[in-house]
């Protein structure tokens, strides 16, 4: 009857808006935040969702708040010269040897990406990497590629690292410690695999030079620290914030509140100008998330997501194991070619739906498969994840071109290796020894 027709038109219209938004994001002609906000506007104007529904049900403000809070907090830490000091320290430790420097800077990036947004990590570390590599007369491209790979792997290990994890943690009952215990071990394993891999692909082509004792002596770490009191206070508050994440489910306070409190306390304690800090927040990303949540909300309301969930189950069968590995590899391959943030935003309600249909409310391994796939898939191509795009843009500005082909040649095999190790990990941990 009439109702059916109506269902069909809005059903297809929500898909149309979604694909339009996606095409805009992938064309890179229009900033992705604007694509998402225009898509969100269409969803509301076309009557698929009301503004109230969009604001109340679809935008995950915990994700937005957590990212904003961490951006503010890291903005304060940045003012102390902490990150420049870390960069100089890594030159000293590596004695200026290109291969050791690549590994140390890569590990620092991976470590930073695990407790702050990976984008922020590479924004801080990329410019320093380029200047350090110039100092030791070697092309920064291998080191930058190492940093991209390790930022995506490091970010997958905790709930506050990569955006897919932030979103999954926010949309489910999973908390900080769940991520540390489940995606953490495989991240560590893959960091090791990545370093061996980098050794294989770049070991030969990096020169064997090193700095003289005299040159190393000239590197003064204390000279780059602009303010010791800001350094002490802001790093202490950062540590307390991370502690807050670890106990957030015990104290019953959501992670966004903890991050925003940390940010505000850091601004107050270090008496820095809030205008300056707020100006440096990556608003583009935050608005991208807001718009995206509404566009995906359109797909949810019109029943597209549940239709996809049913199609997925009938294609793969209701076997939890087969579904889990399908989620892992689908997420991995898809996230290599499309941004892993919109992909995850679409997959979250899809997995919720599948779990309901199959009565698998506690099948957390499906979330781990999504998280691992989306994070590691980001390593497949230069457009696979936000950090990649940012590193490439910053490098191009300095005259170093990381081409799509070069990156894919070096990194796609690494992505496949990490997905293989993850397949074995998920199988052994949740199906062989676990009780699915």
Task: Please identify what each model-predicted range represents.
Residues 20-30, 108-117, 148-160, 247-250, ...:
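Transmembrane alpha-helix interface/packing and boundary motifs in multi-pass membrane proteins
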Residues 3-10, 52-63, 176-186, 226-230, ...:
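Interfacial loop-to-helix junctions that mark the boundaries of transmembrane helices
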Residues 120-131, 144-145, 158-172, 306-311, ...:
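Re-entrant/interfacial helical elements at transmembrane boundaries that shape
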Residues 19-38, 228, 232, 240-260, ...:
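Flexible hinge motifs at transmembrane-helix junctions and intramembrane kinks/re-entrant loops
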Residues 52-141, 283-358:
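Membrane-embedded alpha-helical segments and adjacent helix-loop junctions characteristic
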Residues 6-16, 60-72, 114-122, 186-188, ...:
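Structural signature of hydrophobic alpha-helical transmembrane segments
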Residues 7, 135-141, 157-160, 177-225, ...:
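Juxtamembrane and boundary regions of transmembrane helices in multi-pass small-molecule transporters
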Residues 12-16, 33-38, 65, 99-107, ...:
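Hydrophobic alpha-helical transmembrane segments
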């Amino acid at each position: 009857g009439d109702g059916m027709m109506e269902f069909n038109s809005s059903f297809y219209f929500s898909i149309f808006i979604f694909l339009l938004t996606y095409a805009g994001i992938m064309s890179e002609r229009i900033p992705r935040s604007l694509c998402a906000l225009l898509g969100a506007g269409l969803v509301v104007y076309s009557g698929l969702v009301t503004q109230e529904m969009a604001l109340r049900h679809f935008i995950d403000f915990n994700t937005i708040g957590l990212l904003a809070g961490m951006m503010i907090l890291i903005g304060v830490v940045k003012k102390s010269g902490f990150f420049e000091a870390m960069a100089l320290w890594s030159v000293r430790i590596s004695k200026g040897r290109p291969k050791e420097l690549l590994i140390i800077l890569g590990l620092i990036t991976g470590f930073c990406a695990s407790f702050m947004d990976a984008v922020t990590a590479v924004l801080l570390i990329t410019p320093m990497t380029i200047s350090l590599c110039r100092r030791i007369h070697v092309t920064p491209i291998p080191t930058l590629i190492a940093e991209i790979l390790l930022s995506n792997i490091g970010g997958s290990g905790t709930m506050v690292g990569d955006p897919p994890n932030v979103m999954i943690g926010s949309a489910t009952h999973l908390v900080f410690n769940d991520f540390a215990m489940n995606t953490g071990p495989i991240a560590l394993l893959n960091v090791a695999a990545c370093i061996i891999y980098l050794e294989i692909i770049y070991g030969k082509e990096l020169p064997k030079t090193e700095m003289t004792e005299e040159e190393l002596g000239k590197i003064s770490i204390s000279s780059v620290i602009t303010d010791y009191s800001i350094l002490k206070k802001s790093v202490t508050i950062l540590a307390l914030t991370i502690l807050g994440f670890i106990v957030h489910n015990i104290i019953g306070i959501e992670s966004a509140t903890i991050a925003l409190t940390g940010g505000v306390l850091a601004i107050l304690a270090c008496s820095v100008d809030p205008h300056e800090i707020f100006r440096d927040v990556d608003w583009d990303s935050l608005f991208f998330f807001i718009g995206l949540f509404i566009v995906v909300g359109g797909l949810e309301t019109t029943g597209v997501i549940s239709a996809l969930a049913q199609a997925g189950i009938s294609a793969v069968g209701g076997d939890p194991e087969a579904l889990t590995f399908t989620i892992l590899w689908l997420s991995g391959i898809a996230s290599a070619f499309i941004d892993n943030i919109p992909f995850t935003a679409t997959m979250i309600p899809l997995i919720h739906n599948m779990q309901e249909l199959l009565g698998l409310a506690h099948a957390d391994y499906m979330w781990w498969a999504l998280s691992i796939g989306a994070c590691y898939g980001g390593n497949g191509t230069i457009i696979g994840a936000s950090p990649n795009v940012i590193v490439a843009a910053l490098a191009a500005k300095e005259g170093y071109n990381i081409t799509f082909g070069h990156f894919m040649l070096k990194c796609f095999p690494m992505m496949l290796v990490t997905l293989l190790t993850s397949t074995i990990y998920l199988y052994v941990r949740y199906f062989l020894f676990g009780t699915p």
